[in-house]
Every structure is written in structure tokens, then in C-alpha cells.
């Protein structure tokens, strides 16, 4: 498995990303189905760990999992005007079934606000039925024109939460709770990816939403990636689907609803935040295999002694570490080292006859490729040493990504400075422009306002585009 399979980031960043997806065995383009991918075992194992950590957080905030139909009557999509306009180009329709034309076409789920809204209108009658807090894990389809594995595909996998509340304040509280306690917490603690928490502009918000909040991350090419969104839908979908309830005063009111989701594009964020020119780098908490052991021997006698030591060593790891012993005799140790490095396994343990005699092992850490990350350590206390090292690596990856983002983020005061800064990263600027101004900037620079950060400086400055005074800052960047 030669190193040349990975294009260097400095040569072609896009090809580097595609090479890692392929060589780390994460996914394969499904060329027989336009815009779709096959998520392979290693990629799906990462997604399963993400699901588990997210699901725990979602349930801890009082939500239950449900499952709604994949097919949605087209008339449902047409009920909410902004929603229709936002999703019309991406919708895939089913018009025939059982050899006949359907009386009404179905839309393959692009998102589920409409069909869930229909059922909520049946289930909610009284204020006693609120809040209704549901989440579903599902696949969705959006007919994307330009696709890239994990980052943008026609079919992808996600969770989508949908809740209904008695008041706007409760819906807003829910929207922000998900943003902070579920999404930002997960992405920073599990993925080791620092995020900016913010509000979307009117131009960038979810179609049909009252307000959209997001978390934005910086990739190694300086571009932004939207890692999660949480929407306060106001009463727009409640009015479209007649989601009403009788309040404590026996008055009929429309419910206030929210929706929020993250998807398999987080795997793309993971790749582009931490990986290097040697291959995939995974934060230990999301590594399907945290430790790989490569036994080294030349004959049956050596094999017996080495494997006895390996079995004794790994017995203490069960239930504490996710590990694999790579004792395949059909591949050389060098091949195995390269393979597991490509796949991003955080820690590699090498053990041969000399190590058995000395009661030591060679330990290589993935976040420090080459000699810098390799050391010889005693077998005694190895379990605790590895656990401490994994925790150190998790923190180190986050701090490294945070330092990178800070180094690539700059305050700009003029439009020329903005255009220069977005070539290398995030531009932070005061903003008092209109949606039309936003569109012009995007047309001229291909950059968008990623968010209005929730943390504001509390000072006044002049808008980078209009020159008007404002106390609001925004983040401009090119994005995936």
C-alpha cells in the first residue's frame, strides 16, 4: 500500500480529501446511482459511534425516537410557501407504482417537517399534550447537482428532531438547548472540532423558519463547514398543517415548532479537520479501533511466544479499549503499519520476540507520524498509559484545530480586506447590510455570511460593505 496513493494537501486539497475517503476505506461512489455513495464498514462504524453519542445527548434532553414514512405526499410539500421554494429544485418524485400512474405523486423525503406536521395536527389537542419532543434517524434524498462523498450527496443519513411547544419562548429555548447541549457539545467533545455558534441571516436561514441557528467549523483549507443547524419554525408549519391546541383558558392556539439536524457530512468534517498527508486521523472517542496490535514473528516458535504476550496484554483491555490484534500472516508488518495509519487508528502497538524478552512494546501515536510519535514503553501499566494517551490525543487534536482556526481568522474593516482574507480563512466584520448586499458579495467573492456569532464584542463599528454604524459582527467565509 504505497504512500503515493494520497495526494498532498498542498498539491490538490480536493483530491487529497477524495483519496482519503477511498484509501481509508470509508466510502465508494455508487456510480450506478447518480450522486449516491456506498458507506463502507469503516465509515459506517464511525457513523455508529457518532449516532450513539448524539442519541445519548438527545435522549438526555427529553426526546424520544420515532420513525416516519420515507414517502411524503407532494401536496404536503406545497403547503408551506417558503419551504416549497427552498426545496423544489432538490426534490425527487415517485409518480408510478404497481405499474400505474399515481393519483398523487410522492416526494422522497428531503426533510420531514411536512409529514410530521400532519401527524402532529392529529396528535396535539390540548396544552397537556405539549411539549412534544421527537427525533428520528433516517436517510433523506436531495437531488444535488454537485456531489462530494459525505459533504454533499443525493442520499445521506441524519437525525432530525421535531418538537412542538405552547409558546414562542419555549420553542426558542428548545432551539438553543439543542444547539448548545447537543450539537456544539458533541462536535467539540467527541469530534474535537471547535465551532462558532451563531444565528443565520435571513438569506441563509432554513426555508420556512422564523430563525435558524448553526455551528460553523473551519476546515484545513480555510473554508467553513456547517456542522449542524437548529431552527425555530415559529408558527409557519403549525398554520400550514393546522397544528392547534386548546390552552389553559380554553382558547385555541397554534403550536410553536422546531426542527434540527446533523448528518453524515460530519464524517467529512472529521476528515478535513484532523487528517494529514499520511491519511485519516481520528479523534480517539470516534475511532472504531482505538488501538491496533501488530505482532511480529518469523516462525511458529516466535509466534507462540509473541501471541501469548499479546493475549495476556489485551485481556485487560476488554471493556476499556476498542482494539484489534492484526495477526494476518498474509501481509507484512510494514503493510499493516501503513494500512492502519491510513485508516486513522490512534495508537499502534508493535511487539516482537525482543519486546517479549524485555517486557516492552513499541508504541506509535497517529497524531504524530514518524519517529516523533514512536516510543518504547514497558508492558506493565500499559492499559492505563494508553487510556491517558488517548485522552491527551483527544484534547490535543481539539487544541490544534482551535489554534489553526484562530490563526486563520482576522478582523476586517474594508471590503478589499474582506476579499483578501477569505482567500485564507474566516473574515470577521461589522455588518449592517441588506440581503441584496449579501447576494452581491456572494456573487463577487463566492463568500457568504456563515453566521452572526452569538458571542458579540458589545462594541460599535462600521459595516464592512455599507459603512453604516452597527454593533453586530458576522463571519464571512467560503463554504462547503
UniProtKB/Swiss-Prot annotation:
It holds the Pfam family HGTP_anticodon. It comes from the Bacteria. InterPro entries: aa-tRNA-synt_IIb (IPR002314), aa-tRNA-synth_II (IPR006195), aa-tRNA-synth_II/BPL/LPL (IPR045864), Anticodon-bd (IPR004154), Anticodon-bd_dom_sf (IPR036621), Pro-tRNA-ligase_IIa (IPR002316), Pro-tRNA-ligase_IIa_arc-type (IPR004499), Pro-tRNA_ligase_II_C (IPR016061). Catalyzes the attachment of proline to tRNA(Pro) in a two-step reaction: proline is first activated by ATP to form Pro-AMP and then transferred to the acceptor end of tRNA(Pro). One of its GO terms (molecular function) is proline-tRNA ligase activity. Homodimer. The keyword Oxidoreductase does not apply. NCBIfam families: proS_fam_I. It catalyses: tRNA(Pro) + L-proline + ATP = L-prolyl-tRNA(Pro) + AMP + diphosphate. It is found in: Cytoplasm. Its EC number is 6.1.1.15. Belongs to the class-II aminoacyl-tRNA synthetase family. ProS type 3 subfamily. One of its GO terms (cellular component) is aminoacyl-tRNA synthetase multienzyme complex. The lineage of its organism: Bacteria, Bacillati, Chloroflexota, Chloroflexia, Chloroflexales. The keyword Chloroplast does not apply. Consists of three domains: the N-terminal catalytic domain, the anticodon-binding domain and the C-terminal extension. Keywords: Aminoacyl-tRNA synthetase, ATP-binding, Cytoplasm, Ligase, Nucleotide-binding, Protein biosynthesis. GO terms for biological process: prolyl-tRNA aminoacylation. This is Proline--tRNA ligase.
